[in-house]
Amino acid sequence: MDEMATTQISKDELDELKEAFAKVDLNSNGFICDYELHELFKEANMPLPGYKVREIIQKLMLDGDRNKDGKISFDEFVYIFQEVKSSDIAKTFRKAINRKEGICALGGTSELSSEGTQHSYSEEEKYAFVNWINKALENDPDCRHVIPMNPNTDDLFKAVGDGIVLCKMINLSVPDTIDERAINKKKLTPFIIQENLNLALNSASAIGCHVVNIGAEDLRAGKPHLVLGLLWQIIKIGLFADIELSRNEALAALLRDGETLEELMKLSPEELLLRWANFHLENSGWQKINNFSADIKDSKAYFHLLNQIAPKGQKEGEPRIDINMSGFNETDDLKRAESMLQQADKLGCRQFVTPADVVSGNPKLNLAFVANLFNKYPALTKPENQDIDWTLLEGETREERTFRNWMNSLGVNPHVNHLYADLQDALVILQLYERIKVPVDWSKVNKPPYPKLGANMKKLENCNYAVELGKHPAKFSLVGIGGQDLNDGNQTLTLALVWQLMRRYTLNVLEDLGDGQKANDDIIVNWVNRTLSEAGKSTSIQSFKDKTISSSLAVVDLIDAIQPGCINYDLVKSGNLTEDDKHNNAKYAVSMARRIGARVYALPEDLVEVKPKMVMTVFACLMGRGMKRV
């Protein structure tokens, strides 16, 4: 780091800045580029017109990017805070960083005291999450030692320390992710707790949480901003699980005139929720809302939404619930919000927001409140008579979901909700290249917002660049794949590129551990067999297509060879196996691999069905874990 930037900066201040930098650097590539700045201002929810934000970002890039490489390095970031501190632009930048949820309280850097530097975190979020978790786990005997937590104290940060609550919440969001048999519930020594936290973090990663900056020690120490950040991701995945057309065909009722099902399927869960709320508001004769922050502060839209979705008692066995609208005319915003929440309580949906959260327009908690309303009372009817091609509504395949979760766990931006539609401008693919150490020249990349006219041309240019990078520096096999295919969302060809990205990522991890020695399938298979035989195990594998892998016994034995004694063989079935036996073995194997510290993205079914690509990633991750034993 250059001298000038560090002269008057203490170690604590530097740590604060590093943390702030990491929050803005969404793809964790060590640089901030302009689309990450756009995201920051979007999330900070600042009352600035779009043109003003664009001006600020241009100015920041102009002043901050001193070596003119189109991105801001950490040194340049420090320089902005040190040298440009007094300017209005830098003040706005600092305010945006402070407003982004879960970010440390950045003062004016040099004014920060080196002692007692405090990370700020959102009390509102803590309160909301504690109440949600208390309700979700109230009957779980394994959580009696910590549930119910007091939302007004720091109970939450202590409660997550042994990993059990986190594992349980992951399973509530994506059922069956973690095999309960792999969670340590008794005799919680520090080593056993470490294993639970490994299991929670690697499983969170496997369902698509971005956990790159979080370690088991952070959770054991209950670092508030990291705990809240992880919990929000886990809770949100659960809340959004059914806000997806293939899992909820009634959402087709939200189609607008002239809109195709394909277009509706491209919307993110957030966009679908907004569309859903507006569908009901329109039916009630109330004006539309554009967000779940400023537009809901007066609770009036919420009153109408509750009134529309409350059961009318017309279906058999459905009790009628009447919403009392008298609070609508209350003059005080807080009292009106309280009155609205009392009505939500009648529906069993008083969750996530307090009256103050509604009135302040907290975007995260209001989004959660609305998602929960949708999940309990969608109040939509699947359209019958329309000319709709329902065959489009096939859900994503397991492989597609695994790829998507892998990308999201690396913190790509924007978040990938739909594998093909969200890769059509190649921005995510270009970020993945950076993750596999293929340099990207961001000055060649077109970034959103794209112009109304010619938007697709801009996206296609990105796709062409992505294919070019794949052929040359990355040396992928991309025969017959062009930028147009990515831009069209061609499934087979997009998958071919994405698989090569994931494979390279997996092999890179091994090469880093093996001092740069090239890794390939044969090397992994040989290592697996050598490790098994040295540990006195009788299993072995011929290749990643070996049908014996479907019993998962080779995987289980390998885990036990890497960490002797960790497998409870009473839980493992051998001999003549039924499909159920195989599935139970695979489920245990995947969870145990994650528990000993392997970041496995594959699913138990991949082992049972011996899917060679995913099988390769399982053994490669275990080899990586095995090589760390030095």
Swiss-Prot record:
The keyword Repeat applies. Actin-bundling protein. It holds the Pfam family EF-hand_7. The lineage of its organism: Eukaryota, Metazoa, Chordata, Craniata, Vertebrata. Coiled coil: none annotated. Ca(2+) 1 binds at residues 25, 27, 29, 36. SUPFAM superfamilies: Calponin-homology domain, CH-domain, EF-hand. GO terms for biological process: actin filament bundle assembly; actin filament network formation; bone development; regulation of synaptic vesicle cycle. The gene is PLS3. One of its GO terms (molecular function) is structural constituent of presynaptic actin cytoskeleton. The modification Phosphothreonine is found at residue 391. Changing residue 206 to V: In DIH5; likely pathogenic. Changing residue 270 to K: In DIH5; likely pathogenic. This is Plastin-3. Changing residue 478 to P: Found in a patient with childhood-onset primary osteoporosis; uncertain significance.
